[in-house]
Amino acid sequence: MAFNPPVIRAFSQPAFTYVFKFPYPQWKEKEWLLHALLAHGTEQSMIQLRNCAPHPDEDIIRDDLLISLEDRHFGAVLCKAVYMATTTLMSHKQRNMFPRCDIIVQSELGEKNLHCHIIVGGEGLSKRNAKSSCAQFYGLILAEIIQRCKSLLATRPFEPEEADIFHTLKKAEREAWGGVTGGNMQILQYRDRRGDLHAQTVDPLRFFKNYLLPKNRCISSYSKPDVCTSPDNWFILAEKTYSHTLINGLPLPEHYRKNYHATLDNEVIPGPQTMAYGGRGPWEHLPEVGDQRLAASSVSTTYKPNKKEKLMLNLLDKCKELNLLVYEDLVANCPELLLMLEGQPGGARLIEQVLGMHHINVCSNFTALTYLFHLHPVTSLDSDNKALQLLLIQGYNPLAVGHALCCVLNKQFGKQNTVCFYGPASTGKTNMAKAIVQGIRLYGCVNHLNKGFVFNDCRQRLVVWWEECLMHQDWVEPAKCILGGTECRIDVKHRDSVLLTQTPVIISTNHDIYAVVGGNSVSHVHAAPLKERVIQLNFMKQLPQTFGEITATEIAALLQWCFNEYDCTLTGFKQKWNLDKIPNSFPLGVLCPTHSQDFTLHENGYCTDCGGYLPHSADNSMYTDRASETSTGDITPSDLGDSDGEDTEPETSQVDYCPPKKRRLTAPASPPNSPASSVSTITFFNTWHAQPRDEDELREYERQASLLQKKRESRKRGEEETLADNSSQEQEPQPDPTQWGERLGFISSGTPNQPPIVLHCFEDLRPSDEDEGEYIGEKRQ
């Protein structure tokens, strides 16, 4: 027979009540998994309890099952875990291994949630820390539950569905230690006149007697209360149920519950005999409530902000509307509002707080890339873009670099969270880095001079700019976390350390950032982990002094084009540029044939594959045609009318000239600067070097392409006819020597052994030296 706990007659103060919800919403559909995880060995008993008869019918099996499951079912195990976690919390509060406190825990199977009610009282808890302790309390409870789940691993490994519940608990525990409860740990609260919520103390014994005790027992969602509760302990008006109850670590048996309730009601918590005023009896001469008091009670308690708070709200709205990020922006755009706020007590501090709130709002809603597009919404990538020109001069594919920058600024490039522009002076590295960060505007800088607080300016920023980066042993460890995008805590001047979330980093330097300097020694121990976190672009070519600065609009145009054309993720970057691994040194660009990186002649636009400039058609139409052939697919330059399409006639007639067997059949191409080529091919490709922008341009492009296609077909037919004529000429029989002689002007004399008659046009021809040599030693006729 179970031990009956003594009736609790005093409860430690102050007392608070908590509610813990089991962080697995589908617990009712998979309750059998909870039996296996928390109460291993009770699965068969729970199945048998489903088929038992309800009270008052006699059922020996039912009574035996209820006795055996008294404190072994999963509700009892959950109740014990919560009690142990509560004891641990109070020991932390009182700094004592054996805290002096009172604890009541009751587990219940609700309609939606599996939850536990906790009443705890004692020194160490107060209105100030009871509410803030919810996350810590939640983490301690989950740790106790996980520890009981691990006991199952001693007998067998987890099933897949059991492992799913276990990992859900582990994830919730990690979030709890980060201060996130997800609404699964709540405390009874009240709202004050200002609308703030505070922890509410309770009368623990009355709360226990009136709310927790009058409930019927139900230890499984498959069974019913009339199966688990005997008729002698049935609460008639109770609609809710409970699973298990612990009072200071001792279980409250089901058969003793009604007795316990009666003892509390009669001996411990008697009702008031007299009213609290005047010694009147109950319901005698109650005070009348006047109209004014009724009117006052119906007045709305909505909080009204004062003048200072209204000014702060207006300034915050202005910052969101006009994208104001620094104090100078406030002075330029809303000086009147700024002056009114400066006139308030502590106005400068209030302005800093408003700007800090706006920075937090921007960092939570935008990434560096999306905020850049938010500030520069409509931009087009032109061929005279200086960012495009600079990357081409340094030997890189500007489209590939833009793709990588989009991934890094959008926090989609994995562990490589940093872009480093390395090179000597006057190569454009600072020009490029400055254009990126000034386009984003909300950026922080690293200060080497303030050695104790190097990253003081990096919190609540979209991007970090590390100009002339130098790695020192004092800050190399936090630098590795920041360069890799790992969350870490940084020291801030005159404040506690703050959490720095993942923030992209832009570096421009001419130092070796992989060599760590410390004192009079240089170490390369950190070189490998630093290289895994950095993408380095080497700028080695010096720029002319007239190159100019890259504007924020130009860098935004390049990144916006890449963001619209490519999949800006790590996987998309690897697939687009055929890379198995992103190296530390960014790969150089490979230009298409005939495409140039010389930005002097850039009117024809840029190639969408290599980023190089298309060459000038006026300089060499042959290369333009070849480049166009690679970019236009099936339409070739010969098909678009580069040649005249006319067959050239031979200089001699068919009688006077016999064509060779291997004669060139195609008509010679027109010269590079011919009018026909300039009108057809070059004009077409100069007009359509980019995609049509709307439906009208698309229809015009299709019309011109169809005309050029028809011209190609007509030219093909002419070439086929020429080929047929030449084939017929080759099939004619070759003339014999006599016929050749007649064609050359020799006529046979008709008299035997007489030389032929030579026409007058050949009479003046003198024999050559070779002919003279043929008659040496012979008598000439």
From Swiss-Prot:
Pfam families registered for this protein in UniProt: HBoV_NS1-like_N, Parvo_NS1
Protein location: Host nucleus
EC top class, as a word: hydrolase
Catalytic activity: ATP + H2O = ADP + phosphate + H(+)
Record keywords: ATP-binding, Covalent protein-DNA linkage, DNA replication, DNA-binding, Endonuclease, Helicase, Host nucleus, Hydrolase, Magnesium, Metal-binding, Multifunctional enzyme, Nuclease, Nucleotide-binding, Transcription, Transcription regulation, Viral DNA replication
Residue numbers covered by motif RCR-3: 211-215
Outcome of swapping residue 398 to L: In strain: Eg/BSU-1
Annotated effect of mutating residue 649 to K: In strain: KU3 and Salvator1
Domain description: In the N-terminus, the endonuclease region is involved in binding to the origin of replication. In the middle, there are the ATPase and helicase activities. The C-terminus probably contains a transactivation domain.
Region (Disordered): 621-679, 709-781
Gene field: NS1
Result of altering residue 566 to H: In strain: Eg/BSU-1
Protein name: Initiator protein NS1
